[in-house]
Amino acid sequence: MNRKTGTTTVGIKVKDGVILAADTQASLDHMVETLNIRKIIPITDRIAITTAGSVGDVQMIARILEAEARYYYFAWGRPMTTKAMANLLSNILNENKWFPYLVQIIIGGYVDEPTIANLDPYGGLIFDNYTATGSGTPFAIAILEEGYKENLGIEEAKELAIKAIKAAGSRDVYTGSKKVQVVTITKEGMQEEFIKL
C-alpha cells in the first residue's frame, strides 16, 4: 500500500500576534482516515507547532520540546523564546539527518515578540512573516502572497489563514475537511478554535 499522506498548515505573523491554521483531515493512501485530527500542538502557553508528515515523529518532537521548555524555565526562571525553541528544534532535526524525522514543521509563538519559523526534516530554518507546509503548500502560499500585508490585524490574518487552507483543500486531494483548526497566539495567551467551512 502506498502510504502517501498530506495536509496543509499555515502560519502568519502580524504585529499583535501569530495565527496558525491547519485542515483536520488525516489521509492514508487515497483514503480519508478521519476528518477530526488536530494538527496544531501547543508546546507551552505561548508556543505551538503545526504538523505535516509522520504523526509518530511529530509526537516525539512535541514531547522533546515540551520537556526542553520546562527545563529551560526551571533553569533560567523565564520562558524559552520562540526563536530559541526554533533554533533548538533545528539542531535536533539536523543531528538526526541520517535517520531524519519525516516532518515539516511551522513553529509559532509570542514570548517576547510574534515569531513564525518553518523547519524542514534536515533542520533547515527560515523565519518569515508567513509560511505553509504540506502537500497543499503551493495553493496556500499563492493566497498568502496575494493577501499578506504587514499591517494586518489578528482577525484579518485569521481570515487569510482560513482562506489559504480552504484554497488548498479545493485543489489538493490530501488536504480537506469541513473545518479548519485555528490557533491564535497573542501576548495575552493562546486560543484554539475550529471554524466550519
UniProtKB/Swiss-Prot annotation:
Name of the molecule in the record: Proteasome subunit beta 1
Enzyme Commission numbers on file: 3.4.25.1
Maturation propeptide residues: 1-6
UniProt keyword list: Autocatalytic cleavage, Cytoplasm, Hydrolase, Protease, Proteasome, Threonine protease, Zymogen
Function: Component of the proteasome core, a large protease complex with broad specificity involved in protein degradation.
Sequence similarity: Belongs to the peptidase T1B family.
Catalytically driven reaction(s): Cleavage of peptide bonds with very broad specificity
An individual GO BP term: proteasomal protein catabolic process
Compartments where located: Cytoplasm
Regulation: The formation of the proteasomal ATPase PAN-20S proteasome complex, via the docking of the C-termini of PAN into the intersubunit pockets in the alpha-rings, triggers opening of the gate for substrate entry. Interconversion between the open-gate and close-gate conformations leads to a dynamic regulation of the 20S proteasome proteolysis activity.
Catalytic residues (UniProt): 7 (nucleophile)
Enzyme class: hydrolase
First and last residue of the signal peptide: none
InterPro entries: Ntn_hydrolases_N (IPR029055), Pept_T1A_Psome_bsu_arc (IPR019983), Pept_T1A_subB (IPR000243), Proteasome_bsu_CS (IPR016050), Proteasome_sua/b (IPR001353), Proteasome_suB-type (IPR023333)
PROSITE patterns from the UniProt entry: PROTEASOME_BETA_1, PROTEASOME_BETA_2
GO CC term, one of those recorded: proteasome core complex, beta-subunit complex
SUBUNIT field: The 20S proteasome core is composed of 14 alpha and 14 beta subunits that assemble into four stacked heptameric rings, resulting in a barrel-shaped structure. The two inner rings, each composed of seven catalytic beta subunits, are sandwiched by two outer rings, each composed of seven alpha subunits. The catalytic chamber with the active sites is on the inside of the barrel. Has a gated structure, the ends of the cylinder being occluded by the N-termini of the alpha-subunits. Is capped at one or both ends by the proteasome regulatory ATPase, PAN.
MF annotations from Gene Ontology: threonine-type endopeptidase activity
